A protein has these predicted regions:
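HDAC/HDAC-like amidohydrolase catalytic core signature
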Residues: 1-206
Length: 206
């Protein structure tokens, strides 16, 4: 961004630490307590083959959620037209009761719930364009008619979910699996022919 001259057009904000109550918007207290209790004082604790906790993992995860919620505040309150959160760890693989795929808390799902709870936003849409399918976000949105999840991702690939047939309880899930080697043309087609019509039908507020 600095090299291309965009840095001066950005307003930088440090990630604030989310309260644990925010995490509870999408994860049950038992799960939160398990994560907190699993954070080691040194070394690492493995939650699965891919996902581990180090002494700083909880702080990083809470700041990732805090950044996303602050971004929601800025956009909903009209302080910014858009926002980008450069945060780790990622979140889209974390399910309601399960950390996986390097993800501890589902950052974007929590931010969607935060927008609804804090600001009264009714309908929230999330588009995921990672190479891996966001199974956790899909699981959390599956049965909520006011949440919409769209994803472009490579299949077959971890975590193995994300087929076109996975539509959600209210047709609020849109999956556009791509194959290895697909490029910009296929990606644009998925957006224009599948995801945008789905968004137009859903009519999100955010």
């Amino acid at each position: 961004l600095q090299r291309e001259g965009f840095d001066g057009r950005l307003v930088r904000r440090d990630a604030e630490r989310a309260e644990l109550d925010f995490i509870g918007l999408m994860h049950p207290q038992k799960y939160i307590d398990q994560i907190v209790a699993s954070v080691p004082s040194s070394g690492i604790t493995r939650l699965d083959a891919d996902t581990c906790l180090s002494p700083g993992s909880l702080e990083a995860a809470l700041r990732a959620v805090g950044a996303a919620c602050s971004a929601v505040d800025a956009v909903v309150l009209g302080e910014s037209k858009n926002a980008f959160c450069a945060v780790r760890p990622p979140g889209h693989h974390a399910e309601t009761n399960q950390a996986m795929g390097f993800c501890i808390f589902n950052t974007v799902a929590i931010a969607a719930a935060y927008a609804r709870r804090r600001h009264g936003v009714e309908r929230v849409a999330v588009m995921d364009f990672d190479v891996h399918h966001g199974n956790g976000t899909q699981e959390m949105f599956w049965s909520d008619q006011n949440l919409f999840f769209a994803s472009t991702h490579q299949m077959p690939l971890y975590p193995g979910t994300g087929s076109k047939s996975e539509r959600g309880e209210f047709d609020n899930i849109v999956n556009c699996p791509l194959i290895a080697g697909d490029g910009s043309s296929e990606f644009r087609t998925a957006i224009s022919d599948v995801i945008l019509p789905g968004l137009e039908t859903f009519q999100p507020d955010l």
